[in-house]
């Protein structure tokens, strides 16, 4: 994918210009007024969104305006958030540091952004779908085509090269076709930093970003001496907070492992904004502009991806940003380059992104207001023409081939429901968030009372997907029924259970009859052992697959072997039956009675492999 600034210009030419609203805006240059606004907002909205603790910091025109903390770093201990003392994990905002490192090496002409990444990989290769080359630019914009993947995320740390080599996910899209957020892709960029610079990723980030900016509290590894905030998930039904475990993510460090006190974000944001004494501290002006420019979107009018940053929806000023999620921490960095303004929010509650997004909207409304928008349809679509756009959709960011592929079938992801509410008008409902869009042109809808955009497109397979300006890192597909997958699996399991009961009864009867001449006794014994292994495997597979966010648990590893052994035993059963049938040692009813369980036994392991309930490892066992 070509790297060009033209796409950004095109985007700006098709987005409507906004004038200031008649209401008087708050003064962004009045720090006292800004601080009062922020204090009032967080005092009110943290309870609304059930956020235990938060910290925020603002910079403008090369100066740190203020940092503030709200709520609790630890609910049990009643420890309050202190912006100068409390450490938060920043999650995927780490990706902006990785992207900055890549841009530094690009600036030094050590990396070609349009080069095949295999030029920088040592000891292994990555090939795109249909053998198309994956470029550095593809990794930066999340368009390499990787499937979702986080196996062994918190396993024992390995050298980055080794982990990248052994944990490459499947490819589901050709490079440059769709944006599908990828932690593996950014971890791979971290390895490219190592390969090109000759330093470890940790060393490079420390020597070329953290140290030059004086970010003394920032670290890529957990420091037990730091006052790290606890993080929490909120249960709305029970109205309770649950402390979340600290997940070690060293194997994906370049994708989300940084933690720090919030004032350390000040010099980093100022360096990204090329302001004050931090001008050229990390990158030259033209390199910063290239990093912040739009390099991918499905349509020029949509907000899109830069390198390590994505665009906000159109407002008075263009903004770029990045969010972060790890454990119960939710982080957001928001930059308005034209204004030399930036702020970062740290929260330790799982609803933090809802608070962050609401703050961004409210902040712009008060400090950079625009005139009210009332878009009308420019394309007349009949009720019949609207039908293809409606339905229930889910994000394409799920396991298509990896471990946990069955997850969306038994635990459906969040859905987005789209309904036609009139000619050329769509209502989009995602959770409690509702938007109305009107048709602007074929496959393009614009928010009726806002600046968001909804765009539909066909994939290479002919499937209908859509994407939103407000969420450019994801696409959405129509939700399919889970019934066929569940029904076939349930049928196989019921056959195994029923045949196990019959085999046990048969064995007990055989003990009393002492029928030593039975030709089927050896087969029944082998089949019974195989069934018992399956019955052990199934609860392990279904119970523990969701724990694979970290290191694979021991019970799940046992399931890998038991499934493989059961399958091999059923191959033996099938061969034994063929032998008996050839010798005409069994009658028709006996053959019929055992052929169905044998087929079920032969199909159950492949079924579990297909849905990755026992994972790809079982193939190597077999």
Locate the predicted segments by residue.
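Active-site SXXK
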Residues: 39-42, 56, 62, 89-117, ...
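Short, surface-exposed loop or secondary-structure junction motifs
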Residues: 70-74, 128-337, 350
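Short, conserved catalytic-motif segment at the N-terminal edge
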Residues: 27-88, 110-112, 119, 127, ...
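Peripheral terminal and inter-domain segments
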Residues: 13, 22, 357-622
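C-terminal segment of classical bacterial N-terminal signal peptides
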Residues: 9-19
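Low-complexity, acidic Ser/Thr/Pro-rich repeat tracts that form intrinsically disordered stalk/linker regions
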Residues: 18-28
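Short, well-ordered beta-strand elements
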Residues: 332-349, 464-468
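Sec-dependent N-terminal signal peptides
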Residues: 1-7, 561
């Amino acid at each position: 994918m070509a790297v060009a600034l033209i796409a950004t210009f095109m985007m700006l030419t098709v987005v409507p210009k906004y004038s200031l609203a008649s209401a008087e805006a708050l003064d962004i240059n009045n720090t006292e007024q800004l601080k009062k606004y922020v204090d009032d907002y967080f005092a009110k909205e943290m309870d609304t969104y059930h956020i235990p603790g938060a910290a925020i910091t603002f910079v403008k025109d090369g100066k740190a305006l203020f940092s503030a903390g709200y709520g609790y770093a630890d609910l049990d201990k009643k420890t309050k958030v202190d912006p100068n003392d409390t450490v938060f994990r920043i999650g995927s905002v780490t990706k902006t540091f990785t992207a900055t490192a890549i841009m530094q090496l690009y600036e030094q002409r050590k990396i070609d952004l349009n080069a095949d990444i295999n030029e920088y990989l040592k000891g292994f290769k990555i090939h795109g779908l249909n053998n198309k080359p994956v470029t550095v630019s593809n990794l930066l914009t999340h368009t390499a085509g990787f499937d979702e993947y986080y196996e062994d995320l918190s396993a024992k740390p390995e050298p980055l090269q080794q982990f990248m080599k052994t944990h490459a996910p499947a490819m589901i899209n050709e490079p440059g076709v769709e944006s599908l957020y990828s932690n593996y892709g950014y971890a791979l960029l971290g390895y490219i930093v190592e390969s090109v610079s000759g330093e470890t990723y940790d060393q490079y980030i420390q020597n070329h970003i953290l140290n030059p900016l004086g970010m003394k509290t920032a670290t890529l590894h957990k420091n037990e001496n730091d006052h790290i905030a606890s993080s929490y998930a909120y249960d709305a039904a029970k109205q309770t907070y649950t402390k979340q475990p600290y997940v070690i993510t060293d194997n994906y460090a370049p994708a989300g492992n940084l933690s720090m006190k919030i004032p350390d974000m000040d010099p980093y944001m100022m360096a990204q904004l090329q302001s004050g004494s931090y001008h050229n501290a990390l990158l030259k002006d033209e390199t910063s502009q290239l990093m912040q420019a739009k390099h991918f979107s499905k349509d020029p009018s949509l907000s899109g991806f830069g390198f390590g940053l994505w665009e906000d929806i159109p407002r008075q000023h263009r903004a770029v940003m990045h969010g972060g999620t790890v454990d119960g921490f939710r982080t957001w960095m928001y930059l308005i380059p034209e204004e030399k303004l930036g702020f970062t929010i740290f929260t330790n509650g799982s609803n933090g992104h809802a608070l962050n997004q609401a703050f961004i909207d409210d902040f712009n409304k008060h400090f950079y207001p625009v005139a009210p928008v009332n878009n009308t349809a420019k394309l007349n679509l009949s009720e019949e023409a609207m039908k293809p756009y409606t339905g229930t959709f889910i994000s394409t960011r799920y396991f298509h081939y990896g471990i946990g592929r069955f997850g969306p079938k038994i635990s459906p992801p969040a859905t987005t429901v789209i309904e036609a509410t009139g000619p050329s008008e769509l209502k989009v409902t995602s959770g409690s968030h509702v938007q109305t869009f009107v048709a602007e042109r074929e496959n393009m809808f614009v928010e009726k009372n806002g600046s968001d955009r909804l765009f539909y497109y066909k994939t290479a397979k002919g499937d209908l997907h859509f994407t939103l300006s407000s969420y450019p890192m994801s696409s959405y597909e129509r939700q399919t029924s889970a019934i066929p997958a569940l029904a076939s699996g349930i049928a196989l399991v019921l056959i195994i259970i029923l045949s196990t009961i019959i085999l046990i009864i048969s064995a007990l009867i055989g003990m009393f009859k002492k029928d030593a001449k039975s030709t089927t006794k050896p087969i029944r014994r082998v089949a019974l052992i195989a069934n018992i292994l399956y019955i052990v495997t199934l609860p392990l597979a279904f119970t523990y697959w969701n724990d694979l966010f970290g290191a694979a648990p021991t019970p799940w590893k046992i399931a890998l072997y038991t499934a493989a052994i059961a399958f091999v035993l059923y191959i033996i059963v099938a061969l034994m039956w063929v032998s008996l049938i050839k010798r005409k040692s069994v009658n028709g009813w006996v053959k019929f009675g055992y052929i169905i369980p044998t087929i079920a036994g032969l199909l159950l392991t492949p079924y579990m492999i297909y849905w990755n309930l026992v994972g790809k490892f079982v193939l190597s066992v077999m």
